[in-house]
Amino acid sequence: MSILAEKLSSILKRYDELTALLSSVEVVSDIKKLTELSKEQSSIEEISVASKEYLSVLEGIKENKELLEDKELSELAKEELKILEIQKSELETAIKQLLIPKDPNDDKNIYLELRAGTGGDEAGIFVGDLFKAYCRYADLKKWKVEIVSSSENSVGGYKEIIVLIKGKGVYSRLKFEAGTHRVQRVPETESQGRIHTSAITVAIMPEVDDVEVSINPSDLKIEVFRAGGHGGQCVNTTDSAVRITHLPTNISVSMQDEKSQHKNKDKALKILKARLYEKQIEEQQLANAKDRKEQVGSGDRSERIRTYNYPQNRLSEHRINLTLYSLEEIMLSGNLDEVINPLIAHAQSQFE
């Protein structure tokens, strides 16, 4: 038996073990264990189906090779072997993809944070443009988008916007969006027709639960203050706005979108946990990168990952040297798969 066949046999054995465990009284009565084992079985279900088919094809090849010695059946066996060898090759390709280590965060919802960087008002306008493109992409994927916090600028853009995106495989599709996005275009306010360069940062933070990120209450500094509107005017007369600082890391989150202090505190704490988890992921990625020839990107917000050049209708993805001359169509349709699919393929190729 080949190394691949042995590996697939062990996966099938584990799948059968999990099936038996999930029907046992001991596991059924333990919700935590039941959930844990159900997730594990679900994670290997696709590879298990492919494994059964592959091992069946190997058995078919073995049987037909034996039939080659039979004068009456040899021609039929030859034809059958041709078909089986093609199936074997196709299954091996599919199985190699399925055996690539799965990111444990791939099925999580995310907090998407877009923040204006260099470029003043134009950067804020592009935050709004890119946010709309992400919303269109979410619509295509049947995901749900909820605005958690937003800070508008004076020209219709955003200084910062944070949204929660929920749906199947959200993190797996959007995790490579983290970093600095640069835009080159002529602003509407530019009378001389000069091209301006602006930049915004994108952060992708998996939504986490209390089990995944545990925070010691004594590590938190919680401040309350009055929420302010545009130009500093007061939008309510109570101390409803909340700022939470995680003292060991100095990561701080402010929230004032809700009128209730309790709701603002709850939102701020969720985003703080997501940021702490994001920090853990970045540290792990940097450690893993040392063992790999190349990486798509660390997810570091300071890393310039993409340029949107409107005069040339060009989108350049710097991490994989991808250039597309369909920028406006991508932004208006939200069809970000044109960029995301090559990024995912590149990341997977690093494990082959």
UniProtKB/Swiss-Prot annotation:
Secretion signal span: none
Predominant subcellular localization, coarse grouping: cytoplasm
Cellular compartment(s): Cytoplasm
Pfam families: PCRF, RF-1
Modification comment: Methylated by PrmC. Methylation increases the termination efficiency of RF1.
Domain of life: Bacteria
Family matches, as InterPro entries: PCRF (IPR005139), Pep_chain_release_fac_I (IPR000352), Pep_chain_release_fac_I_sf (IPR045853), Prokaryotic/Mito_RF (IPR050057), RF-1 (IPR004373)
GO (cellular component) term, any one: cytoplasm
Chain intervals with Basic and acidic residues compositional bias: 289-306
Gene Ontology MF terms: translation release factor activity, codon specific
Modified residues (N5-methylglutamine): 233
Stretches the record annotates as Disordered: 288-309
Keywords: Cytoplasm, Methylation, Protein biosynthesis
Physiological role: Peptide chain release factor 1 directs the termination of translation in response to the peptide chain termination codons UAG and UAA.
Family named by the database record: Belongs to the prokaryotic/mitochondrial release factor family.
UniProt name for this protein: Peptide chain release factor 1
Protein source organism: Helicobacter pylori (strain J99 / ATCC 700824)
Highest classification ranks of the organism: Bacteria, Pseudomonadati, Campylobacterota, Epsilonproteobacteria, Campylobacterales
Gene: prfA
